[in-house]
């Protein structure tokens, strides 16, 4: 595709099918390396935070990074840079039965109730001694312990990313940028659902296509449809396993 054509396509508001599958294979491998490099952070915060409470400030830093990132790429931070998500997916996931995540856990009412409960708990705890920075750190460590424990139990009983389906920060990211960098399906999908089996969030993909198709991609000349999946982690696992190479981010 020429630079001029690419600019015209962008100016017209068209979303193009991006990287080829071979490139996404490299991206998926890179994501895996990143996850193995950062998963131990959650263990350091939980264990080390008992003696050094200031380690707890890693928690709000990750939370803030997730919210800011959400405005640009939805739940990208969840899928690539969240230490707990990496821990649940790569470490605890080895002993998970990988059962389907119950759909009621994804319902907005439940998710926002969890968000309100967690934020309320954090505010009440901090209010007990708001002038002590170490107390703030202890509160963050306590929250990390509680939520990670819930995540581990759910991962062992159901699916590695069960907690992530209603994680308060994930909910925020979905709310502010769930439509950013969307997953797209080009013409030629045979509905084999290999993408859904590979998805770490256990998302429904094939049946969530936007009924209004996008204009054909200049690079492939195939029509495309945006997948309505605000909880997509932008991990590329589905892109790599697609036998027809019709998926893209």
Predicted regions and their residues:
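Non-ligating segments of multi-cofactor redox enzymes
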Residues: 1-215, 219-222, 230-249
């Amino acid at each position: 595709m020429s630079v001029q054509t690419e600019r015209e396509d962008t100016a017209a508001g068209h979303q193009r099918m991006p990287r080829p599958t071979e490139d996404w294979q490299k991206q998926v491998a890179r994501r895996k390396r990143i996850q193995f490099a950062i998963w131990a952070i959650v263990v350091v915060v939980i264990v080390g935070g008992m003696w050094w409470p200031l380690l707890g400030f890693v928690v709000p830093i990750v939370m803030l990074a997730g919210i800011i990132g959400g405005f640009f790429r939805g739940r990208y931070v969840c899928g690539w840079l969240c230490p707990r998500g990496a821990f649940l997916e790569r470490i605890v996931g080895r002993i998970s039965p990988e059962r389907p995540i119950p759909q009621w856990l994804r319902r907005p009412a439940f998710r926002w109730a969890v968000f309100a409960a967690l934020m309320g708990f954090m505010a009440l705890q901090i209010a007990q001694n708001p002038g002590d920075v170490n107390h703030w750190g202890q509160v963050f460590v306590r929250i990390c312990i509680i939520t990670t424990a819930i995540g581990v139990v759910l991962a062992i009983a159901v699916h590695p990313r069960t907690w992530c389906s209603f994680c308060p920060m994930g909910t925020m990211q979905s709310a502010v940028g769930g439509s950013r960098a969307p997953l797209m399906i080009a013409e030629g999908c045979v509905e084999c659902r290999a993408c859904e089996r590979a998805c770490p969030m256990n998302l429904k993909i094939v049946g969530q296509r936007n009924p209004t198709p996008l204009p054909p991609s200049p690079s492939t000349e195939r029509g495309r449809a945006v997948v309505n999946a605000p909880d997509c982690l932008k991990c590329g696992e589905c892109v790599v396993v697609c036998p027809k190479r019709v998926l893209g981010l």
